[in-house]
């Protein structure tokens, strides 16, 4: 979710009300832990290196910071085929190049059915470039996840 630099990190609190997994803004140096949802803090990209988060300013991508493409690319490098990238509703093409990198490294991409997206261009663009991605409505995402 692209947020304002002054949003105060609302996404984590929204996600905490939506389900059982704990969501939090990643802090620079935090270890990646299973069972948690990590969100890029406002105005920062979130990268993964050596099982830790790197939270940086960096240039805007797809006119946004944070953007998901830097996260997807770094996760693909760090975890290869163990990465699951999820592209949800949104504008422009953020998530597309990162999805391509995840697939090239053997990872899995799940894309929200564009017909159910409030803003379909992100899922449409990702699906155009990664046609073998799994497509599902948001309620069906859990059953789309590979069993590891």
Where are these regions (language model features)?
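Conserved acid/base catalytic micro-environments in cytosolic active-site loops
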Residues: 1-148
């Amino acid at each position: 979710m692209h947020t304002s630099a002054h949003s105060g990190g609302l996404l984590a609190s929204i996600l905490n009300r939506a389900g059982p997994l704990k969501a939090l803004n990643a802090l620079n140096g935090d270890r990646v832990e299973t069972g948690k949802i990590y969100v890029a803090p406002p105005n920062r990209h979130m990268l993964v290196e050596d099982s830790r988060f790197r939270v940086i300013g960096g240039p805007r991508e797809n006119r946004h910071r944070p953007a998901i493409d830097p996260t997807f690319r770094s996760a693909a490098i760090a975890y290869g085929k163990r990465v699951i990238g999820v592209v949800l509703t949104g504008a422009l093409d953020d998530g597309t190049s990162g999805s391509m990198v995840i697939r090239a490294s053997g990872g899995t991409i799940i894309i929200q059915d564009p017909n159910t997206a409030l803003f379909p261009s992100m899922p449409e663009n990702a699906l155009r470039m990664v046609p073998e991605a799994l497509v599902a409505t948001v309620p069906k995402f859990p059953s789309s996840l590979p069993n590891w």
